[in-house]
Amino acid sequence: MSQSAPQLSWRLLRVWRRDWLVTRKSWLIGFMTPLLEPILYITSLGFGFRILIPEIQYEGHTLTYVVFMAPAIIATNIMYTAFMENSFSSFVRMYYQKTYDAIRATPLSVDEIIAGEIMWGATKSLMAATIMATVLSLFGLVRYPTGLGLLPLAFLGGLLFGAIGMLFTAFVKSIDMFNLPIFLLITPMYLFSGTFFPLENLPNWAQSVAWALPLTHLVSLARNLCLGTVSWMNVLVSGGYLLAATMLLVPLALRLMRRRLIQ
Amino acid sequence: MSDNVIEVREVQKRYGTFTAVDGISFDVKRGELFGLLGPNGAGKTSTIRMIYGFSPLSGGSLRVFGHDITTGWRDVRARLGVCHQEDSLDEEMSVRDNLEIFAGFFGIPRAVARDRANRLLEFFGLENREKASVRELSGGMMRRLAIARALINEPDLLILDEPTTGLDPQTRHQLWEKLARLKNQGVTIILTTHYMEEAAQLCDRLIIVDHGKILVEGRPRDLVAQFVGKQIIESSPVCEGLRRFVTERGLEHEDLGHRMLIYCKDDENIYHEITKTYCQDNCILRMGTLEDVFLKLTGRELRE
């Protein structure tokens, strides 16, 4: 039960199914947020900045601000959705509802519970990204077929940010402590990952820092997929970064949660 | 295969430097209702958790259904049900959904799950509340649902950690009746409780543990007969004359200051002698109980 090699099987889908069935009960809230969020952003930032920022230079392309910013709304939402799910929501299930304790009386391992939870977080990111991309498509802000790449990207990004959320769940003593990673990690990423302005506007050292952060790669890929300007180099570097980070952090999250839960 | 559903051998559980379970051994036989008693912090929950593979053992060996729990925990858990001390139901879900979703963890097909949920809802008198969310249920209903959920995989072994704590007497008695019926259906049950009356009524056999060790093991009635006798004289307040009498006669007793228990070991004449000479009104002759055994063995000072 406490071996260092993860004990994983397809049973993790049973945890995923549980989360799906429970979330389905309040589907309207889950559906409305990604539906309205892009509309709010586009109307506020689009109309608000239209006169201040007539156009923007991005990797040799001249774009309107809305076209530049829209893909970042999807990318940041992918980050927030999975991170929140596997930090606050997973903590509630673990600590207050004792859901994990209950499942640990069935033939499921701790690894399967946590992996199922991370997979569920990624699924939520995927669902939200699908709805948001659909809305943005109606405004002509997503090019196809490259735009379809947003779907696997959302799932991969969801796995990564879910694992990051779960890493903190493995440590925090109380639910309020999640404000710390949000303040120190998530919010700075939200502001400095090429989301609202091109990274080229930053000093060189800050650009280097930004490229070390996962959201920068998620935004870069999302933007190039939406614009139809995605290159193999882009996929290789940023996709490779996200994939490698996921393959590193998911097992780490499993390991740390095992340490927290198995006593 | 032996008749033992659970075989615990020299099992230890340590948390850092603290030893919660200190080398205990016992068996639970098929079809038995087995009690695990002890004061708070005695090691009951730690023991229970090792039985279903929730906590790894720090030492010793533990077999359930003949499987070593450390390696065969999946097979074991498929055949057992656990009702935790703390409620772990899905609050926002309905009563029925709680049962059917939990069935999913055992890989039970949906049609079978629905069928079993129907039967369990009826068995526990929850059929009229199947659509209610757990948040709307009373404490007693929640506990019934938690036990129903533990039965969704039709387990051969049911583990109940303080199932009746905090319930009113009506609900408690009703639960006892349900447990007796489950036992008649052949389910082996292991139970922890702080209610000695409950243990005395329900348990075929029990152990009393304290400081991680087993103090005694046996049938409730045998333990009462062995440690306190069938009858006890209780006097409150205690007069000096009685104190002298008890010491002179060398009677086994416990002097609690304002109250005295005299273990008269079935010698009724002692009671008549005492009431005649010392305290007509302050003395009663009553049955010895498991609670007397428990307090005698584990002491009367507060725990934790």
Give the predicted meaning of each segment.
Chain A
Residues 1-144, 152-263:
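Hydrophobic transmembrane alpha-helices and immediately adjacent juxtamembrane helices
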